[in-house]
Swiss-Prot record:
GO terms for biological process: autophagosome assembly. The chain crosses the membrane at residues 12-32, 68-88, 101-123, 159-179, 182-202, 219-239. PANTHER family: PTHR43220, TRANSMEMBRANE PROTEIN 41B. Belongs to the TMEM41 family. This is Transmembrane protein 41 homolog. The lineage of its organism: Eukaryota, Metazoa, Ecdysozoa, Nematoda, Chromadorea. The gene is tag-175. Pfam families: VTT_dom (PF09335).
Length: 246
């Protein structure tokens, strides 16, 4: 049970997390090389595909001589967006595919997604329980009943949820601590589960200049990839059920 003093400290902890991100973003911005006034207006997190294109052009111009600054900037902003459930990470995923080699981009996106989700999880665990229970009472009750039967399969369920678009990622992040999902399977399930959809957007990002909308990342082959990944994530659970029934 939480004490009154620990409950009081929670808002300060969130402010500390927010301040840490603010300082980190400022540090990256301060270490970025001098840019023209026209370029400076595009140094912001992308809200749409056109923003991503403009930002990509600026970052790619300075990336060769300032690789670590560009990389750190993408990481800090990506984790920040994930931590506070701010829309825009999909465009950073596409941008990562444009700026970095595939293997760097996929590790970056999976790591940032898992880290940001874990921070969001922690914030929700500290003081978001009443909000989640009040806003989503029926869903939480149903999920609690379902998960109570599969306490040993949290990792597989988390991978499945991240691969499929059944539940919004932000809702998974804030509901998981309320459902007593341990942080370890939550983190690694997120890391592994976001890989298949991120693969598609990173590939699309390699042709960012030609993209007209984000839906071009989707095709029958991409649907097959995600469906196959979802089935594989549930395969151990289904196999375990079959062995028990036999």
């Amino acid at each position: 049970m939480e004490t009154k003093s620990s409950q009081t400290s929670h808002p300060w902890l969130v402010l500390l997390i927010f301040a840490t991100f603010a300082v980190s973003i400022f540090a990256v911005y301060s270490n970025f090389p001098e840019v023209s006034a026209d370029e400076k207006v595009h140094l912001k997190y992308p809200r749409n595909l056109e923003d991503a294109k403009q930002l990509g052009r600026v970052l790619s111009k300075y990336k060769e001589n300032n690789y670590s600054v560009v990389l750190c900037g993408v990481i800090v902003v990506y984790v920040f967006l994930q931590s506070f459930a701010i829309p825009g990470s999909i465009f950073l995923t596409i941008l990562s595919g444009y700026l970095f080699p595939f293997y760097v981009a996929i590790v970056l996106v999976c790591s940032c997604s898992a880290t940001g989700a874990a921070i969001c999880y922690t914030i929700s665990k500290l003081f978001g329980r009443s909000f989640v229970l009040q806003k989503f009472p029926e869903r939480i009750a149903k999920w609690q009943d379902d998960l109570s039967k599969h306490r040993d399969d949290f990792l597989n369920y988390m991978i499945f949820l991240r691969v499929t678009p059944i539940v919004p990622n932000w809702l998974i992040n804030i509901a998981s601590p309320v459902l007593d999902v341990p942080l370890a399977p939550f983190f690694w399930g997120t890391f592994l589960g976001v890989a298949p959809p991120s693969f598609l957007y990173i590939q699309a990002g390699s042709t960012l200049e030609q993209l007209s909308h984000t839906s071009v990342a989707w095709s029958w082959s991409s649907i097959v990839l995600l469906t196959g990944s979802a089935i594989l994530s549930l395969a151990p659970i289904l196999l375990k059920k079959k062995l028990k029934s036999d």
